[in-house]
């Protein structure tokens, strides 16, 4: 809660990362080339509700201040994502490169939130489909079977 999170990119993956992180109280900043009106409706709503900060700008290394707890490289350009990952690793910032699992300090889990519990399911980045299937299987269990006894 309260930690700086930077997401570079504003596509499907970036939106998914932000959607999962929002309930946990991080200070999320999204930077991408798109103008605000070009963003997905969900992102525009988060901006209006001041749940995230948005900067419409091209990536440059000055974007990464060094105060970030997590950075997500989620642009549609693998070279830019690689540059972001290298900068973060030099600065000691945890980074997730959506283009290259080898440049990830962590894998983003699939999350199930139920009442006061959060379940994170992560794989080794080789099979996202398997992780998604397991999450769905758990979510489809009757409520009583999902809770510890």
What is the predicted function of each stretch?
Residues 48-63:
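Glycine-rich, highly charged phosphate/nucleotide-binding loops
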Residues 108-149:
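Adenosine-phosphate binding glycine-rich loop
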Residues 28, 54, 92-95:
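Hydrophobic beta-strand scaffold residues
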Residues 70-75, 81-107:
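ADP-ribose/adenylate-binding Rossmann-like module
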Residues 1-19, 149:
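Glycine-rich adenosine-cofactor-binding loop
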Residues 16, 24-46:
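NAD(P)-binding Rossmann-fold cofactor-contacting core
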Residues 12-13, 79, 125:
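Residue-level detector of alpha-helix initiation sites
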């Amino acid at each position: 809660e309260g930690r700086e999170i930077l997401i570079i990119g504003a596509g499907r993956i970036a939106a998914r990362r932000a959607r999962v992180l929002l309930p946990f109280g991080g200070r999320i900043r999204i930077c991408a080339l798109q103008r605000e009106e070009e963003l997905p409706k969900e992102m525009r709503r988060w901006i209006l509700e001041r749940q995230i900060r948005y900067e419409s700008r091209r990536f440059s290394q000055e974007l990464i201040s060094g105060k970030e707890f997590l950075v997500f490289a989620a642009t549609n350009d693998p070279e830019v994502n690689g540059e972001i990952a290298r900068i973060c690793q030099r600065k000691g910032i945890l980074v997730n490169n959506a283009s290259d699992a080898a440049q990830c300090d962590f894998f983003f889990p699939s999350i199930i939130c139920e009442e006061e519990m959060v379940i994170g399911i992560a794989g080794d980045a080789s099979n996202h489909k398997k992780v998604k299937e397991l999450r769905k299987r758990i979510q489809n269990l009757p409520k009583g079977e999902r809770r510890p006894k």
